[in-house]
Amino acid sequence: ALRGFGVIDSIKTQIEAICNQTVSCADILTVAARDSVVALGGPSWTVPLGRRDSIDANEAEANSDLPGFNSSRSELEAAF
Protein backbone atom coordinates (compact mmCIF):
# COMPACT_ATOMS: atom_id res chain seq x y z
CA ALA A 1 0.00 0.00 0.00
CA LEU A 2 1.13 3.52 -0.69
CA ARG A 3 1.85 5.81 2.22
CA GLY A 4 -0.53 8.66 2.91
CA PHE A 5 -3.83 7.02 2.08
CA GLY A 6 -4.67 6.98 5.80
CA VAL A 7 -4.43 10.77 5.76
CA ILE A 8 -6.76 10.97 2.76
CA ASP A 9 -9.24 8.61 4.44
CA SER A 10 -9.15 10.73 7.60
CA ILE A 11 -9.78 13.93 5.62
CA LYS A 12 -12.63 12.29 3.70
CA THR A 13 -14.26 11.06 6.93
CA GLN A 14 -14.12 14.55 8.42
CA ILE A 15 -15.51 16.19 5.28
CA GLU A 16 -18.31 13.63 4.94
CA ALA A 17 -19.40 14.43 8.51
CA ILE A 18 -20.11 17.97 7.29
CA CYS A 19 -21.27 17.42 3.70
CA ASN A 20 -21.90 13.75 2.97
CA GLN A 21 -21.49 12.47 -0.61
CA THR A 22 -20.36 15.86 -1.93
CA VAL A 23 -16.58 15.63 -2.01
CA SER A 24 -14.85 12.73 -3.73
CA CYS A 25 -11.45 11.23 -3.02
CA ALA A 26 -10.38 12.69 -6.37
CA ASP A 27 -11.27 16.17 -5.04
CA ILE A 28 -9.20 15.60 -1.91
CA LEU A 29 -6.21 14.27 -3.86
CA THR A 30 -6.38 17.17 -6.31
CA VAL A 31 -6.51 19.81 -3.57
CA ALA A 32 -3.73 18.05 -1.64
CA ALA A 33 -1.55 17.97 -4.77
CA ARG A 34 -2.23 21.63 -5.50
CA ASP A 35 -1.51 22.66 -1.90
CA SER A 36 1.72 20.64 -1.90
CA VAL A 37 2.90 22.42 -5.04
CA VAL A 38 2.06 25.81 -3.49
CA ALA A 39 3.80 24.88 -0.21
CA LEU A 40 6.98 24.17 -2.20
CA GLY A 41 6.83 27.56 -3.92
CA GLY A 42 5.06 26.51 -7.10
CA PRO A 43 2.02 28.07 -8.74
CA SER A 44 -1.54 27.85 -7.48
CA TRP A 45 -4.66 27.15 -9.52
CA THR A 46 -8.39 26.92 -8.95
CA VAL A 47 -9.69 23.42 -8.34
CA PRO A 48 -13.35 22.91 -9.29
CA LEU A 49 -14.91 20.82 -6.54
CA GLY A 50 -18.08 18.78 -6.18
CA ARG A 51 -18.92 15.19 -6.84
CA ARG A 52 -19.80 14.57 -10.45
CA ASP A 53 -19.49 10.83 -10.35
CA SER A 54 -22.03 8.33 -9.16
CA ILE A 55 -22.09 6.99 -5.63
CA ASP A 56 -22.70 3.51 -7.01
CA ALA A 57 -21.32 1.64 -9.98
CA ASN A 58 -23.47 0.79 -12.99
CA GLU A 59 -21.84 -1.58 -15.47
CA ALA A 60 -24.49 -1.07 -18.17
CA GLU A 61 -24.10 2.73 -18.09
CA ALA A 62 -20.32 2.48 -18.08
CA ASN A 63 -20.39 0.17 -21.08
CA SER A 64 -22.73 2.45 -23.02
CA ASP A 65 -21.34 5.86 -21.95
CA LEU A 66 -17.57 5.32 -21.92
CA PRO A 67 -15.59 5.05 -25.14
CA GLY A 68 -14.22 1.63 -25.99
CA PHE A 69 -10.57 0.68 -25.72
CA ASN A 70 -10.35 0.53 -29.51
CA SER A 71 -12.09 3.87 -30.21
CA SER A 72 -10.52 6.06 -32.85
CA ARG A 73 -9.13 9.49 -32.05
CA SER A 74 -12.14 11.19 -33.63
CA GLU A 75 -14.52 9.01 -31.59
CA LEU A 76 -12.65 9.90 -28.39
CA GLU A 77 -12.72 13.62 -29.22
CA ALA A 78 -16.45 13.47 -29.95
CA ALA A 79 -17.13 11.71 -26.64
CA PHE A 80 -15.72 14.61 -24.67
Curated annotation (Swiss-Prot):
Main function: Removal of H(2)O(2), oxidation of toxic reductants, biosynthesis and degradation of lignin, suberization, auxin catabolism, response to environmental stresses such as wounding, pathogen attack and oxidative stress. These functions might be dependent on each isozyme/isoform in each plant tissue.
Record carries keyword Transcription regulation: no
Catalysis performed (reactions): 2 a phenolic donor + H2O2 = 2 a phenolic radical donor + 2 H2O
Bound cofactor: record note: Binds 2 calcium ions per subunit. Binds 1 heme b (iron(II)-protoporphyrin IX) group per subunit.
UniProt-recorded name of the protein: Peroxidase
Enzyme Commission numbers on file: 1.11.1.7
Positions annotated with a glycan in the UniProt record: N70
Molecular function GO terms recorded: heme binding; lactoperoxidase activity; metal ion binding
Protein biosynthesis among keywords: no
